[in-house]
């Protein structure tokens, strides 16, 4: 995961501001003992991707219903089952991650999240329960998928949080578009954060996703992201 944001001083400052908060959050959560019941993983499968309800830090990707061909999803399910217990830097895991990246950034499907009305609504929904159900540490709303890194609050499960995000935004997006039917894909990916290096890698991955996908150049920030929101707020304060 390359960091392309360090070339511009303004972008570097934005990223540093975010990382100070993110690293403090990781330090606070790391103080919880390993035998604390809040740290114990709980698995959910329901015939789809296995999901780990893990507190505190989770990296989540969820997608529009038509963003990935169905046959690819079926292949991912089997590979995820096989690789779930392997080390994250295992070549098989890295190859799978590269293939997933390819489909995420290829712009398959109708890409409803390109509509600024919908991207804005999805971001507002993400921030609505900030500090209540979770703390959003980093996020990026791409044309056909969303990446989020959150610190889950005690008493809340990932499945509850995901339902809250997707049910409301699907309903509102369909109203905006004047359509009915599926909006989000049922399956989603989640990974718990193992350590500070893993967290920083994930943050760099999220921050750089619009650049990698060719949506912006390296001197700009994607508006529907944690960096974009921070940039907008910095601009408001300087005016």
Regions inferred by a protein language model and the residue ranges of each:
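Short catalytic/metal-binding and nucleic-acid-binding patches
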Residues: 1-239
């Amino acid at each position: 995961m390359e960091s392309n944001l360090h070339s511009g001083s303004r972008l570097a400052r934005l990223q540093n501001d975010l990382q100070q908060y993110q690293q403090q959050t990781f330090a606070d959560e790391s103080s919880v003992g390993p035998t604390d019941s809040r740290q114990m993983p709980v698995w959910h499968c329901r015939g789809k991707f296995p999901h780990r309800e893990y507190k505190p830090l989770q990296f989540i990707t969820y997608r529009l219903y038509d963003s990935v061909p169905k046959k690819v999803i079926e292949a991912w399910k089997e590979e995820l089952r096989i690789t779930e217990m392997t080390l994250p830097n295992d070549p098989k895991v890295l190859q799978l991650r590269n293939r997933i990246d390819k489909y995420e950034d290829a712009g398959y499907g109708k890409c409803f999240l390109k509509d600024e009305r919908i991207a804005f609504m999805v971001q507002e929904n993400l921030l609505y329960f900030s500090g209540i159900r979770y703390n959003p540490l980093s996020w990026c709303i791409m044309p056909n998928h969303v990446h989020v890194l959150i610190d889950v609050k005690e008493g809340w499960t990932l499945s509850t949080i995901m339902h809250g995000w997707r049910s409301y935004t699907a309903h509102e997006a369909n109203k905006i578009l004047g359509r009915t039917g599926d909006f989000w894909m049922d399956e989603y990916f989640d990974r718990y954060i193992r350590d500070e290096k893993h967290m920083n890698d994930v943050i760099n991955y999220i921050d750089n996703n619009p650049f990698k996908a060719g949506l912006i150049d390296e001197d700009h920030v994607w508006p529907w992201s944690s960096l974009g929101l921070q940039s907008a707020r910095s601009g408001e304060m300087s005016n």
